[in-house]
Amino acid sequence: MLTKLLLPTPATAVVVILFFLSVPIGSGAWAAGLISLPGITFSKASRNFRLLSATGSGSLDDPFIVVEEVFGEGEVLLSINVYDADFGSRIETMHAVGFALQKVVINQTRKLWNHYALELEFDVGRGSDYYDGLSFGQKSKVNRPFRSDRFSWVEDLTEPRAVIRFTQGQVRPGESVRFTFAITHTQLTPKFYLVQHVLPPYAELDDDLNFPIKLAACCDKMDRLD
């Protein structure tokens, strides 16, 4: 008895691929570099990190927890898109959109991080200012003081750009760090970038993590030579 082998048509193959792309993994739908949760998506906008997971609902009791693995140099750009007009403020503020966010970042570089900064931008290179409606919970006490499990000093800035700077701590290669904060906006469906500056505020000799040269000290010595 002969059995006829049925090969999938191109149309069938496309349907199968689309099906697997639509299958949720964990609590969010996942594609390469993009994770979608109800009402919001998180996606890669730079090639120097891996977006590993995103969970939660964005409330104070159940914050979004985004896990990343940074392996390259330069700024880390995470794109955030609130696509549901009914998303609302999930942190009990008067903003059109608001959510609590925890970022877990794994240091897979060869550098010691003595400094970490988070900044909001509408477009890459165009920082969020005081009047554009995008902020780290501007004029709100939600989740404040912002905090980290590895940095003890936090600078919460609103002017001229929305920036949170974390210092007085360190994250060695292979270690992870957690940041807790909030993001708000006055529009219903904003799309923006969370920019992460991972370069420490000093120069290093070779790759020795024990002998940093602070830039402030270098500038002071140069001024004395003038």
List each model region and its residues.
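N-terminal secretory signal peptides that target proteins for export/translocation
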Residues: 1-8
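Short, intrinsically disordered, low-complexity terminal segments
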Residues: 8-10, 26-29
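Bacterial N-terminal signal peptides
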Residues: 12-24
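Short loop/turn positions at the edges of beta-strands in beta-sheet-rich folds
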Residues: 25, 107-109
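Membrane engagement elements in two modes
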Residues: 30-100, 110, 121-127, 131, ...
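Buried hydrophobic-core signal for structured, non-transmembrane domains
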Residues: 103-105
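Short acidic/proline- and small/hydrophobic-mixed sequence motifs that coincide with surface turns
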Residues: 111-115
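An exposed acidic His-Trp-rich patch
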Residues: 116-151
